[in-house]
């Protein structure tokens, strides 16, 4: 299952962060972002579809 933030939508051709992967990890475009602090839920980075800044509405591992 994939999440893209509070809006809950999935960007075309890109899955931004998936449950079970490290925080801030992008799947689909083949690039990983920087890791966000555990429990804080903030991620920055790039993926194959361009730069993004992403917020997690809940804490993952």
Swiss-Prot record:
Keyword list, A-Z: Keratin, Repeat
Expression across tissues: Expression restricted exclusively to the cortical cells of hair follicles.
Function in brief: In the hair cortex, hair keratin intermediate filaments are embedded in an interfilamentous matrix, consisting of hair keratin-associated proteins (KRTAP), which are essential for the formation of a rigid and resistant hair shaft through their extensive disulfide bond cross-linking with abundant cysteine residues of hair keratins. The matrix proteins include the high-sulfur and high-glycine-tyrosine keratins.
Family annotation (InterPro entries): KRTAP8-1 (IPR039351), KRTAP_type8/19/20/21/22 (IPR021743)
Protein name: Keratin-associated protein 8-1
Subunit details: Interacts with hair keratins.
Lineage: Eukaryota, Metazoa, Chordata, Craniata, Vertebrata
Signal peptide annotation: none
Region annotation (11 X 2 AA repeats of G-[YCGS]) ranges: 13-49
Alphabetical list of Pfam families matching this protein: KRTAP (PF11759)
Gene giving rise to this polypeptide: Krtap8-1
């Amino acid at each position: 299952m994939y999440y893209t933030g509070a809006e809950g939508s999935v960007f075309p051709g890109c899955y931004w962060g998936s449950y079970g992967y490290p925080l801030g990890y992008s799947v689909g475009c083949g690039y990983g972002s920087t890791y966000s602090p555990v429990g804080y839920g903030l991620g920055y980075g790039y993926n194959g579809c361009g730069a993004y800044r992403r917020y997690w509405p809940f804490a993952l591992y």
